[in-house]
Amino acid sequence: MTPPRIFIDGEAGTTGLQIRARLEGREDLELLSIDPARRKDPEARRELLNAADIAVLCLHDDVAREAVAMIENPATRVLDASSAHRTAQGWAYGFPELTKQSREEIRAARLVSNPGCYATGAVALLRPLTDAGLLPPDLPLSVQGFSGYSGGGRALVEAHEGRGEHPMAGPFKSYALSLIHKHQPEMARHGGLKHAPLFTPHVGGWRQGMLVQIPLHLGLLGVTAAQLHEALADHYAGERFVRVMPFEHGQPADPILDPQTLNGTNELELFVYAGPNGEHALLVSRLDNLGKGASGAAVQNLDVMLGLEGAGHSYRLAEGG
């Protein structure tokens, strides 16, 4: 049997490079590559987009939309790693663990949108709790994200590593202070919320690794931190890549969180922290923004689309690889 053909449009970018690295050596897939000299040639791209069984788009939003328009072969399926289609009608949301229906929706879909990194951390915490009725969908929420500099793309990586300049380069920067960020609609739609949360992202001087935090006033909700933890643990029970960390005596075992702990993996850890008087809770997710937040999730989604998820691939990559 001929292995499925995969074309990564944008394989020279941060996410594209890591997707390709995670797929290298896979004998059950065939990777199609564009001649580097023709990387910006629309006809060369069109040819490969239509020759692939799955086209993976690692492009800016406008270019991703153009790439979708180039695909005329009805048999070509699309996995879009941009934010162009994450709330678009007709596109499956590529988070297999998010709901009981998610895997089948991804498996059956022709068009799949890979989640954003910050949004992955947020909706992983929110969706099980809104579905369980523990968080009302109209609850005003604040979300904070802390990412390594690779979350800013190739230009920011090069600036941090001495190959260019970028206004976001430095040990720690807050941004999107207009209070508008492209992940907010995704957080609302797939987190089960009626309104976008107030979201403030921050980028630090480490290469990769991310924390996403959501504070809650439990006294206003009429729920306990233990109930929140139980709902998350029940929802993700048995999942290979999403772990709800133990909750004993009102706290996880780890009082200090390093955003880099899961680097190189496709794993996602969820924590519930509780204040001593039971009035407050802090929901936290930890992931590699280039792993479960981007390329690891993309390779997992490829396998779900192709019915290969049960093959046991780890989707791991060495840190910084």
Curated annotation (Swiss-Prot):
CDD domains hit by this protein: AGPR_2_C, AGPR_2_N
Active site residues of this protein: 117
Any GO molecular function: N-acetyl-gamma-glutamyl-phosphate reductase activity
Keyword terms, alphabetized: Amino-acid biosynthesis, Arginine biosynthesis, Cytoplasm, NADP, Oxidoreductase
Substrates-to-products reaction catalysed: N-acetyl-L-glutamate 5-semialdehyde + phosphate + NADP(+) = N-acetyl-L-glutamyl 5-phosphate + NADPH + H(+)
Entry-linked SMART domains: Semialdhyde_dh
Pfam families assigned: Semialdhyde_dh, Semialdhyde_dhC_1
Gene3D superfamilies: Dihydrodipicolinate Reductase, domain 2 (3.30.360.10), NAD(P)-binding Rossmann-like Domain (3.40.50.720)
Functional summary from the UniProt entry: Catalyzes the NADPH-dependent reduction of N-acetyl-5-glutamyl phosphate to yield N-acetyl-L-glutamate 5-semialdehyde.
Family named by the database record: Belongs to the NAGSA dehydrogenase family. Type 2 subfamily.
Protein's name in the database: N-acetyl-gamma-glutamyl-phosphate reductase
Organism (species): Deinococcus geothermalis (strain DSM 11300 / CIP 105573 / AG-3a)
